[in-house]
UniProtKB/Swiss-Prot annotation:
It holds the Pfam family Ribosomal_L27. GO terms for biological process: translation. Residues 1-22 are annotated as: Disordered. It comes from Vibrio campbellii (strain ATCC BAA-1116). The gene is rpmA. Keywords: Ribonucleoprotein, Ribosomal protein. Belongs to the bacterial ribosomal protein bL27 family. Gene3D superfamilies: 2.40.50.100. This is Large ribosomal subunit protein bL27. InterPro entries: Ribosomal_bL27 (IPR001684), Ribosomal_bL27_CS (IPR018261). The keyword Ribonucleoprotein applies. GO terms for cellular component: cytosolic large ribosomal subunit. It comes from the Bacteria.
Length: 85
């Protein structure tokens, strides 16, 4: 004879794996060519000088130097560029 009633099922208990998005190299940090600067969905940050953009909108360094974040343009867009050291 069962001492516990049969447990009902729940419809919760699932979640997707985190995607580890965000800024990986901050302003003033030194980077080498190929280093990932920002992982993002869409273009929250835009590519400036010496920065490339991947098919998933990842921003990466094209040359070595220091990372620089700036806001410019009429729409106040955030740009990431690399300045030579």
């Amino acid at each position: 004879m069962a001492h516990k009633k049969a447990g009902g099922s729940t419809r919760n208990g699932r979640d997707s794996e985190s995607k580890r998005l965000g800024v990986k190299r901050f302003g003033g940090e030194s980077v080498l060519a190929g280093n990932i600067i920002v992982r993002q969905r869409g273009t929250k940050f835009h590519a400036g000088n010496n920065v490339g953009i991947g098919k998933d909108h990842t921003l990466f360094a094209l040359t070595e130097g220091k990372v620089k974040f700036e806001v410019k343009g009429p729409k106040n867009r955030k740009f990431v560029s690399i300045e030579a050291e």
